[in-house]
Amino acid sequence: EDGKNLKWQYQSAQGNTGTAAQIARKFVGDKSDVIVAIATPSAQAVVAATKDIPLVYSAVTDPVVAKLVPSMAPSGTTVTGVSDALELGKQIELIKRVAPAAKRVGIVYNPGEANSVVVVEQLRELLPKHGLSLVEAAAPRSVDVGSAARSLIGKADVFYTSTDNNVVSAYEALVKVGMDAKIPLVAADT
């Protein structure tokens, strides 16, 4: 009967790709009827673990670049979901309102995360059209976010954060650096 015998299993990888892979393999081994993955690394782990169990993803900026689906058109795969792609033009307008004197936008991101790379590439193209430049600092792990942000002091006039999973999971470190250095922070996601 519909609505009966539904079992939910919830696991969090806490931003760790190795843990995401373990969780995906566990759900596949449990013969789940459907797997819901939140964030690109988790969705990628599920796609790597199964081609048979349906995957519904969310919080994925570009599922094509992340290699979850071959295109945004119906693909006939077992993978579907919702993109959280940012309207970067509006984000840039907000940056200019928050920090009108700013010329250099600092971003901390994980260069190994497809979502983040897409956003950084788009910012490299868009910011100069608005009289701004991009200053980048890599944070391949959550523990790197604070030191990456500190490396931008004196180089960035404003911080911008996208939907990078490492940055979001270590957000307090970025906020602290911004507050201590009096660098405004514009966030696309918190």
Regions found by a protein language model. Name each.
Residues 1-190:
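Short hydrophobic alpha-helices and adjacent helix-cap/hinge residues
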